[in-house]
Amino acid sequence: MKVLIVGAGLAGLTAAEDLVAHGADVTVFEARDRVGGRTHGVEVAPGRWVDAGAAYLGDRHTALHEQITRLGLKTTPTTMTGDSRFLLGKDGETRHGRFPPLSAVALGEMFDLLDELTAAVDPVAPWQTPDAARLDTLTAQVWASEHLRHPDARLFFPLFLGEMMAADPASVSMLHVAFYLRSGGGTRYLNAFEGGAQQDRVDGGAHQLCEQLAAGLDVRLGTEVLGVVSDHAGVTVHTGQDGHRADAVVVAVPPLLADRIDIPGLPHRRAGDDTGRGCTVKVNLVYPQPIWRDHGLSGWSVNAEGPLLSTVDDSPAWGGAGVLTGFVTGAEAHRYGALTEAEQREEAVAQAGRIFPMLPEPVAVHVTDWTSEPYSKGCYAALFGPGDWQRLGQHLTTPHGRIHWAGTETSTEFFGLMEGAIRSGHRAATEIIAEVTNEWSTLR
């Protein structure tokens, strides 16, 4: 059995590994000059790497933990020891824990409303959720204007969506928000560090997962797939002037990229006109050491104004540097991404200094703009706009002939996370193995 994989991220490489284990001859095509997809690392000191892409995981991410253990990698807790900083008004405030200096009653009511929506979502078929048609035509911005009365809730809601989903409330459907939160384990789990989805990091960076998976596979870098043709006998994958024949193919790239592949006869698009890209620019500010810890601070901050809408301590577990990672998300990511490199550095360094006045000049600033990355089309994941779940939902995982789909956007569990990507890869491989097994049984 010959299988081709489009995309060398966690989903594609997981599917490839599973298929090879079942005796398949597998080739992986990757348009970039590296493997990893939306995982990516930057070296901040000799032998010390941190995540410029996907980074965090929790105890419920069982497939990811299994992969980490099997590959001999380790995790380290996300550093949250110390006080947090909040710049939500004219003056900054330092306080213990992560709860912002806003009305606890107002934010509690906001989270209760989100929990009610989340609990009602059909996790397998969100488009069949009660009241799905209305929720899917409603943007998160409109929902907030109708349901959030307190100014503190209205201030915090877009910051929350930016942190959780890299979403601009004006462009994402409320059904998608509810599904995303349900898929990720619920509002509080997805938002939590200790005991939540952001509890740990992979020592040395999550990009190592894909690098180790790829080491034992036939991976063709710099090879963009332009077309896929499925027929009764198999598939042909076109890369430039070359055609590659196989029994099946797994397309494991984000919907906006899959939509660019010419697939004759595909009855439904992989993305809609209103499907957005996760709006994220990740800024790794590198210092000689995590000096904020000496001042009793965790490195965590939440800020009403950009570019850095939140920060976290991502310093390597074994020392060598202090790394403060800033997240530029939502609409702010578009503004910041349009700046020059010098302007981006200047703004990030200046704001980090306002949040943490004890900071020295950084030794390096690494800016990774996922919104403009041509072979990702955003990060953390695609954002479904008004009507997208109604139009696209039931087709996200349905094979088209011998074409199968993977990627975190096709996962009903942990959509948008590394865990979702890995689970989708396992699912796609299982589909192909079952399909071939059934064909062999029929021939007998």
Predicted stretch roles:
Residues 30, 36, 68, 144, ...:
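Generic structural signal for small/hydrophobic residues in well-ordered secondary structure
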Residues 2-28:
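N-terminal Rossmann-like FAD-binding beta1-loop-alpha1 element of flavoenzymes
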Residues 37-64, 120-129, 178-188:
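Glycine-rich active-site loop/strand segments that organize a redox cofactor
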Residues 13-14, 22, 97, 234-236, ...:
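Conserved flavin/dinucleotide-binding core of flavoenzymes
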Residues 20-45:
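Glycine-rich FAD pyrophosphate-binding loop
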Residues 122-227, 232-234, 252, 261-262, ...:
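Active-site/ligand-binding neighborhood in enzyme catalytic cores
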Residues 48-120:
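Dinucleotide-binding Rossmann-like beta1-alpha1 core, especially the glycine-rich loop
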Residues 223-224, 229-232, 236-296, 358:
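Central helical "cap/lid" subdomain
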